[in-house]
A protein has these predicted regions:
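Non-catalytic, polymerase-adjacent accessory regions of viral genome-replication enzymes
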Residues: 1-119
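Conserved polymerase palm-domain catalytic core
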Residues: 124, 129, 176-180, 184-188, ...
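Non-catalytic, peripheral interaction segments enriched in hydrophobic/basic residues
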Residues: 403, 407-464
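Acidic catalytic cores of enzymes that act on phosphate-bearing nucleotides/polynucleotides
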Residues: 444-446, 453-526
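Short, charged surface segments at domain edges that flank catalytic/cofactor-binding sites
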Residues: 507-549, 573
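Histidine-centered nuclease catalytic patch
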Residues: 551-584, 590-599
């Protein structure tokens, strides 16, 4: 650990010393969980199908026990999960291979980016009887508004421990979380939140006003005491307390943390969701009575009264909106929400919290949501479109001498990613605008590279007619087999606009009764990932949308790679028969085994 400067934080040093080795964590890992007590020797030898099956089954048991109110059984199953060797192996994989910050070290400077280092990490953690929580390393990343967002990066061992703890704690809370919470939860996404906005604010609903709420520094200010009270006396509670109180090191100076959960920790989003859970239940206590008549002339006969919630609610992490029929209803709920947040150490950001008419629109998760002639429109946010185009301009300006092929290779995934995010909204007109702007940007870039040449010469060099489309910015590329073909800039207008199918109410992947529902849902998403009839679609269909290494669904949230069964340099082809889709971590495992052979 880096030395701490000056003596003004003596109490902080003492706090670190108190965190050194006080919490039992992984002692007595059961031998029948993996079948052996021998130390792990080879990362590539792990049977991920078996490992994931064991962890999934245990998560489902915790979920069902929570649903049934069997709290002693929940505690016992949580203890079993914390001792599970399979959970440890899967947690190491997620912290060192699947997590976006896998290559970022904590204050100890350690990472585990190779199979050998992962094996050493597993064997080291496996022998621990007392856990040593270390402070996080403070780093900053830029925000969209130009400010800096602070992150707290735990050590790699703490990240693994947090992943282990998350698998024990998360399924129990998944059985209790409110239905309209969509952020940082398994099987849920931004698009589910946007689709719920669309469903709530369509012409059948009479809500005309929205509270567009912003919580001031939610992750940094959540009350530790409230989180600990909310999770109760569960196994590993003291370890969670240590993570909350661990502090952080910035410029070799230790700082205490008296509130908040560090952004950068694997368990932090779950703890934030636990703290913010309950707004939906709070609002459900306010209802309105609606009277239905059998016919307009029979108002005194056959009347039906129905209690309806006065408010609509959608939350994604710390961003949420509340809808109601009148402005008075919205203004009346604000003081109640403020009091509710204050109990958690939080407050609304008055500058960014707005009360607006739905007809005027509001921004939420990158979309502008607005009622127009009785319909709810979800349009790409103007500021996001500008920022996207500006990013392309800046990159081309900085790469004026880059080849056409490199430009296409860099821009196409970015353009396709932007389109895939917004394809579930009212985006066709915006897509057309962006395509035309990108064409203009590339035309100016092409001209600037050859100031002494005429426009006709530039057009012949950079533009082709492809599939009857004229003036396509393109380049002739050679594949690994020496075959030449023309590659063009991807067009957003080629993306099919289709509504996202929202997740059902409280549905969770941990519910064993919904296994088929989640499999079908993942397959439905996969069928929109590749064009139907394409080579990659056929490959996925042939392998029944499952990774052939770990047995999990291809679209379980992990990054995908396409593997050649027979390498191209050994005579293999790029045809569907020689390809198989794998999760990125599974793909690396295959390449670590020289003799690995996959079935079709």
């Amino acid at each position: 650990m880096p030395p701490l400067k000056d003596g003004r934080l003596l109490a902080g040093v003492q706090a670190i010393n108190q965190c050194e080795g006080i919490e039992p964590f992984v002692k007595d890992r059961v031998s029948n969980d993996i079948g052996t007590r021998e130390p792990l020797k080879d990362w590539a030898s792990i049977d991920w199908k078996l490992i994931k099956k064991r962890v999934r089954n245990l998560r489902q048991r915790i979920y069902r026990a929570t649903q049934n109110g069997q709290w002693n059984k929940v505690r016992s199953l949580m203890k079993l999960m914390l001792r599970s060797y399979s959970n440890l192996l899967l947690s190491v994989r997620r912290a060192t291979q699947e997590n976006q910050g896998k290559e970022t070290a904590g204050i100890d400077g350690q990472t585990a980016t190779t199979p050998k280092s992962r094996v050493a990490l597993v064997n080291e953690i496996r022998e621990y009887t007392l856990w040593k929580v270390r402070p996080t390393k403070r780093v900053y990343i830029p925000k969209s508004n130009g400010k800096q967002r602070p992150l707290g990066i735990p050590t790699i061992k703490d990240r693994v421990a947090q992943a282990v703890m998350k698998n024990a704690l998360e399924p129990s809370w998944e059985a209790k979380f409110e239905r309209h919470s969509y952020g940082f939860r398994p099987g849920r996404s931004c698009h589910d939140a946007i689709e719920q906005c669309h469903a709530r604010l369509n012409k059948q609903c009479k809500d005309e006003w929205v509270l567009d709420a912003d919580i001031r520094g939610a992750f940094d200010n959540i009350s530790h005491e409230f989180i600990l009270k909310a999770i109760g006396e569960i196994p590993g509670r003291e370890l969670i307390k240590q993570w909350l109180k661990a502090g952080y090191v910035e410029s070799q100076v230790f700082h205490e943390t008296k509130s908040g959960t560090p952004q950068g920790g694997i368990i932090s989003p779950l703890l934030a969701n636990i703290a913010l859970d309950g707004i939906d239940h709070l609002l459900a206590g306010f209802y309105k009575v609606r009277i239905y008549y059998s016919t307009p002339k029979a108002k005194r006969q056959r009347t039906t009264k129905q209690k309806l919630s006065r408010y609509g609610f959608i939350r994604y992490a710390d961003d949420f909106i509340v809808t109601a029929e009148t402005k008075e209803d919205i203004e009346g709920i604000i003081p109640i929400l403020k009091q509710w947040l204050a109990e958690r150490g939080l407050e609304l950001n008055e500058e960014k919290t707005n009360v607006v008419r739905v007809e005027d629109g509001f921004n939420f998760l990158g979309f502008k949501i607005q009622q127009f002639r009785g319909s709810c429109l979800t349009i790409p946010q103007k500021e996001k479109v500008k920022a996207f185009l500006q990013e392309i301009r800046y990159w081309l300006k900085a790469h004026k001498h880059t080849s056409q092929e490199a430009v296409i290779k860099y821009l196409n995934p970015i353009i396709r990613g932007f389109g895939n995010y917004y394809k579930h909204g009212t985006s066709k007109q915006v897509f057309s605008y962006i395509d035309s702007q990108i064409w203009k940007i590339l035309w100016k870039w092409s001209l600037s590279r050859h100031p002494e040449k005429g426009k006709k010469w530039v057009a012949r060099k950079y533009y082709r007619t492809i599939n009857r489309r004229k003036w396509q910015f393109s380049a002739e590329v050679t594949d690994r087999r020496g075959k030449k073909e023309a590659k063009a800039i991807f067009r957003l207008m080629d993306i099919l606009i289709e509504r996202h199918v929202k997740v059902k109410d409280t549905a969770s992947p941990d519910n064993p009764l919904l296994t088929k529902y989640w499999k079908d849902r993942q397959t439905t998403y996969g069928k929109t990932y590749w064009e139907k009839g394409s080579k990659y679609y056929t490959v996925a269909e042939n392998q029944e949308w499952k990774c052939t290494v770990c047995g999990e669904h291809l679209f379980n949230g992990e990054e995908l790679h396409t593997h050649h069964k027979v390498r191209v340099k050994d005579g293999g082809t790029d045809e569907a028969e020689n390809l198989v889709h794998l999760h990125k971590a599974c793909h690396k495992q295959v390449h670590s085994k020289c003799s690995e052979k996959l079935e079709a």
